[in-house]
Amino acid sequence: MSQKTLFFATANVYKFEEFSRLFANHGIELEHYDVAIPEIQNIDMSIILRDKVIKAYEILSRPVLVDHSGLAMSALQELPQGLNKQFWEVLKDQVCELATKLDDRRAEMIVYLGFCDGRRIHSVYHREPGEIAYKLSSQGTFHLDRVFIPAGHTVTLSEMSSSERDKISHRLKVTEKAIEMLRSLPYGIELGLRKG
């Protein structure tokens, strides 16, 4: 592993590509570790993230970064959050219709990034306010991005260009928090984020 390379474990190549662009802006190259990490079922996304990052470290035996994203819908008392995968599998393209029927489109996109160096687990998260679109976007590869419109915008994340999305997305904001977190750790020296 080179001085400024960090492993990122995900089976989702599109997610890796987006985070890779965002970390590259800070001089960190992400190396893709293509693995589908089995997820426990829990509403609490921090518990899911902790479990995922431990499993990723056990498989890779190297410092590793993982993410977990979810949606919190106001009309559903902040659900589905950690149960997002199951929620999406059941509702598929009916998420927008559900928000219309409940007459409350407010939602937050939540994303966690976790880092394990073999000794400790560190994590950061970001909650991005917005709303559920009236109609599922036909564009994009992330199911959440196809239904979520960030506050102050009129289109879903999936309808934005990569450059536009990279300037405002929840992934950008959690990446910035992760850079600060990594900078504060001994591993930050190895990544070139601070001097020893």
PLM-predicted stretches and their roles:
Residues S2-F7, Y14-G196:
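Anionic-ligand binding patches
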